């Protein structure tokens, strides 16, 4: 099964479970969790079901396209359901079956791996899902997002697309993976992998990046003061990516690193609080919609 068919299969499976199929969010981020479809929607009491593919940029993992397993940008298939259904593990195993992986014929293990994202003030109880000894999915019950306690708890399922495809297609080099008929990951992404690695480690202007971080930080605070959550959060994401670029280039010392993470966390907490307050002013409208649908 090629990657395109994998994605279509997962979309169909989770769509059948009532998930909204969203498209990737258009601002750089290090993980699918950072999308507003997850970060913001996990806050507050309103129900939410979503599935989407998210390109995830990790500048420090760039290897000029020369490493068979490390990528500047990989892809995650993200599922968020709030509140978490009792049969979520069963639904997940059914999704593997849809991909041609029979849980009865493979060694599938849930290995405890509690999750934390300090820069976003997020934490949760979690498990890595191992398929015949290789991690393919992260399973997390959110306890805290943006420093706020999650009530009700959301469940997040994050499939590593390239990693899962490596298993399904039995390929050792990620660039050999078939994306769709006639196109490999090498065809689609190798040039960008090389160029982003050159930029990250060699040609980026660190003085400009430091200035951008401060500018983005100010703008995030400014928009939150006006109650504009989504523009503010875009700038939080930009701060995070800019920090990752500086960190990957070694431009930030160990002591400075803690301070920068703290500044991003402060922004994320402020966004989370503002989002909750703004939804509360609206009377948490999706709660009313859910109640109406059950009448």
Swiss-Prot record:
One of its GO terms (molecular function) is transferase activity. It holds the Pfam family tRNA-synt_2e. It is found in: Cytoplasm. It catalyses: tRNA(Gly) + glycine + ATP = glycyl-tRNA(Gly) + AMP + diphosphate. Belongs to the class-II aminoacyl-tRNA synthetase family. It is an enzyme of class 6 (ligase). Its EC number is 6.1.1.14. The gene is glyQ. The keyword Lipid biosynthesis does not apply. This is Glycine--tRNA ligase alpha subunit. Tetramer of two alpha and two beta subunits. InterPro entries: aa-tRNA-synth_II/BPL/LPL, Gly-tRNA-synth_heterodimer, Gly-tRNA_ligase_asu.
């Amino acid at each position: 099964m090629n990657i395109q068919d994998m994605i279509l299969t997962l979309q169909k499976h989770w769509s059948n479970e009532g998930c909204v199929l969203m498209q990737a969010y258009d601002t750089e981020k290090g993980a699918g969790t950072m999308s507003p479809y997850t970060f913001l929607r996990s806050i507050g009491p309103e129900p939410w079901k979503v599935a989407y593919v998210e390109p995830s940029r990790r500048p420090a993992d760039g290897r000029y396209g020369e490493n068979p397993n490390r990528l500047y940008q990989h892809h995650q298939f993200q599922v968020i359901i709030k509140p978490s259904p009792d049969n979520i593990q069963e639904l997940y195993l059914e999704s593997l079956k849809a991909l041609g992986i029979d849980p009865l014929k493979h060694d599938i293990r849930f290995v405890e791996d509690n999750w934390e994202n300090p820069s976003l003030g997020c934490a949760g109880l979690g498990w890595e899902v191992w398929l015949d000894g290789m991690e393919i999915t992260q399973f997390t019950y959110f306890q805290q997002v943006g420093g706020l306690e999650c009530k009700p708890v959301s469940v997040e399922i994050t499939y590593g697309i390239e990693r899962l495809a490596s298993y399904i297609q039995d390929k050792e080099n990620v660039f050999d993976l078939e994306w769709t008929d006639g196109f490999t990951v090498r065809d689609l992404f190798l040039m960008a992998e090389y160029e982003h690695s050159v930029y990250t480690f060699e040609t980026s202007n660190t003085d400009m990046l430091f200035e951008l971080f401060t500018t983005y930080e100010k703008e995030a605070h400014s928009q939150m003061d006006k109650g504009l959550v989504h523009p503010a959060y875009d700038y939080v994401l930009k701060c995070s990516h800019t920090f990752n670029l500086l960190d990957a280039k070694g431009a930030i010392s160990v002591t400075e690193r803690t301070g920068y993470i703290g500044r991003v966390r402060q922004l994320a907490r402020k966004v989370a609080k503002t989002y909750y307050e703004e939804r509360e002013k609206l009377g948490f409208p999706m709660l009313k919609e859910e109640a109406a649908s059950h009448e």
